[in-house]
Amino acid sequence: MTIQSCDLDIVREPLLRPFAFKGGAFTEKWLTAVCLRTAEATGIGVGGLAILWSDPAVFGAHTETGGNLLMALVTEFAAQALVGTSPASPMEAVQTLLPQAHEYARNLTRLPELRRTFALNALVGVDNALWQLHAARHGLTTFNQLVPDFAKDALCARQHRLVRLPAITYSFDDARLAVLAESGCFLPKIKIGHPGTQEEMLARDCARLTELHAQVGCAPADYSDDGRLLYYLDANGRYESGDTLRRLLDHLDRIGMLDQILLIEEPFPEENQSEVGDLPVMIAADESLHDVDDVRRRIGQGYGAMTLKAAGKTLSMTFAMAAAAHARGVPALVADSGCVPALLGWNLNVAARLPSLPGMSCGILESNGLESYRNWAELAHAHATCGAHFLSRDTTTFELGDAFHAGHAGILDPPKPYAAGVSA
């Protein structure tokens, strides 16, 4: 099945407020819609561009618009590179495209040390379109049929409930926080690593966490083994040394918060190769994971969980990383990457098939689109089969029955409303 042509469209989704994390903030979400055509079928994939998350150096060197345009050009490069080829599978295509896209992006951004996450993020829309073509070619109609044999053991769970983790950014509405905490099913993913020097960051993080713990720390939680609310802290690589992180942990211990920490995600810059197995909390890897070798290296350094991002680093790479973590007995979880409804199903399908983390009675999925996008309701309505359909009435959980596990959560359908820009 040879790819004969491609098309690309860009959509800019407005946010309710700036999304602040990793020492910066962005004000709108850019999405690429990628169309790949063969003689037999058409695949349309959406990719959400995450410049600040994937490489802050690009974000800092350009305007918000400029950084997004650079990543969109990498997506265009990858789609064009596929024309005239006949990849055996999406995974084979991504394996070939990733080094090419990374080299192109390094030259484009003039950053020799550009993080591979930038290139992976640019490939998401291309990969999603490839999976639609793959399904059409082989007559596949469910997500279970998409899972390659090598990843089936890693994705053998069948969660019927996922706790939805909203991202609590620096500017999150405290009134909304209180409402969520009262639900009894609240697991906040708190963005730490405030802007400023390391000392300023630490002081602001300590103050903010003290405030949050006083506000919601006693809230009940029906998802944890001991009934207490748990916290998920995400530093996005802002802590430059183990000493600074230990000072934060000492503060959390003093205020009685430490034993309610489920995990801390990506505390150090990805070039930091420190051992973390001696820390008193579970440490998860995220941005520093680009392939299975990175998964194995982080596990060797004591990282206790691997964060997967089907909608941030491609489904193809997610399958490979999930299998690598499972082979070494290390749990995995799924994070959101600011998904619009049309992208949510890609993450939801993976999260629903991972075992629960230690201390949890069900699965989890970070999903912050509801709090982030101005037009969330309209976007969810437009793509009626998307993952947002499974949100509970109070929006704290995804309720997943047998019908969900027998389907695909909309990922094999044209991603409305974005398909209109490339389907003519």
Put a short name on every predicted segment.
Residues P14, F19-F21, G48-P56, L165-S171:
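Glycine-rich phosphate/pyrophosphate-binding beta-alpha loops
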Residues R37, T42-H138:
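Metal- or metallocofactor-binding catalytic centers and their adjacent structured scaffolds
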Residues Q132, A136, A323-A327, N349:
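Short glycine/serine- and small hydrophobic-enriched flexible loop segments
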Residues I192-G345:
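Catalytic core of soluble alpha/beta enzymes
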